[in-house]
Amino acid sequence: MIFITKKTIEELSETHKEPNMFTCYSTPQSFSATTSRAILLINSNRFVVLFLNLFSSKVVHKIEFEIADLQKQKFRAGNMLSAIWSFNAKGQSWNFRIPQKILTLGSMQSDFLNYLQQNVLP
């Protein structure tokens, strides 16, 4: 992973972000993924995936899902380093590895994971 900062994440996501959205940096791990780096945005209605280029400096693809369309969700916080969130949507399987802590992002990662567990997961 290239050195990523909160400012970079905010700049890349600002035009795609809706009110009350939580943000995190993740590694997509499915065949449906466009690239191997992504910013995830989530609120009570919508989930947005912003796929990033190799250097995490540019959004190259965007996918949106309605929260109600996320099916067969699974969440695993197996170790202290990262959590795995998977689900099916739009006929495809999606899998994201979300680091639980990235020092340069402050509480961004944990805020996203807490929101996900409390408000989105069944």
Language model regions located:
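A generic structural signal for ordered alpha-helices
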Residues: 18, 25, 48-49, 90-94
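Residue-level detector of functional hotspots within protein domains
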Residues: 6-8, 26, 33, 51, ...
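Short, compositionally biased strand/turn segments
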Residues: 36-56
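Acidic, Ser/Thr- and proline-rich intrinsically disordered linker/docking segments
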Residues: 3-4, 57-122
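Anionic N-terminal interaction surfaces
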Residues: 1-40, 122
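Charged, low-complexity, helix/coiled-coil-prone segments
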Residues: 7-18, 49-64, 120
